[in-house]
């Protein structure tokens, strides 16, 4: 690998001169600049990004930590798309770090981005507790924002969706449409989002005077296959239901396929709704009713807050978003 010293020898200048040319700091004649750039091109030299970052006041980068167990869903591809696009609009490069499979690995991913001198960092945590995240924020000077988790101490550093209330509202709409027997497919139960959506389902039943039937709850893993498996589990139990709520659209699509294969008509016999309102939802047959989570607005808010902090702005109150049920063909009133 070519070094800066080798570039300097090729250009016939000092190493310090090469450094000034590449950093743009200090006066260097145009003739000398041309010789240095020619030497760089001929030698294939690439500056050490980490070394440059160590001395720079700003790297024009934003970091994002997401655990790889969340990569498979369409929801997260849309999240990453919006994060990269909005970072670009702010003149920043988005750097992604993998939180992998544990709180310790999420912590290591955050430290990796800090070591790269990212100007600010976003975290979409799966394993770190809110107390651990608060401690991380307190320990570092770079702005750190948390997506989809409500913090206790550093509440202004969180942008989140109230999944419990959003789930409550969606289930309440089903009840108000006449549904009394409502099945629920959870996501992975190590996910705070899944726990909150299940809690919202239970609260909606309780508030409307409907007894909780555990036979109507099946655990999934966010995937279409687990949605189909959840339906098979419900039917094998002999569960009777006129509506089914899946904790994301991937599972809802798998559930509709399983119902179709079992000869259960959607929505005539069972109405189905999901969460996230992914791009394919209007194009399934029947078109999937889904709770739209305002991902674009959440990303816009979190990046806006990070840039505001970098510009010296004072902290703002926490920002809470809520979802909205988009009714399509998969949802009708139950047949009498």
Swiss-Prot record:
Regions recorded as binding DNA: 4-23
GO biological process: DNA-templated transcription; negative regulation of DNA-templated transcription; regulation of DNA-templated transcription
Pfam families: LacI, Peripla_BP_3
Residue ranges constituting the HTH lacI-type domain according to the UniProt record: 2-56
Keyword set includes Transferase: no
Residues of the signal peptide: none
Coiled-coil spans in chain: none
GO molecular function, one term: sequence-specific DNA binding
Gene3D superfamilies in the cross-refs: 3.40.50.2300, lambda repressor-like DNA-binding domains
SMART domains the UniProt entry points to: HTH_LACI (SM00354)
Xref: SUPFAM superfamilies: lambda repressor-like DNA-binding domains, Periplasmic binding protein-like I
Alphabetized UniProt keyword annotations: DNA-binding, Repressor, Transcription, Transcription regulation
Task performed by this protein: Repressor of the asc operon. The cryptic operon is activated by the insertion of IS186 into the ascG gene.
PANTHER family given in the database record: HTH-TYPE TRANSCRIPTIONAL REGULATOR ASCG, LACI-RELATED TRANSCRIPTIONAL REPRESSOR
Protein name, per record: HTH-type transcriptional regulator AscG
Organism from which the protein derives: Escherichia coli (strain K12)
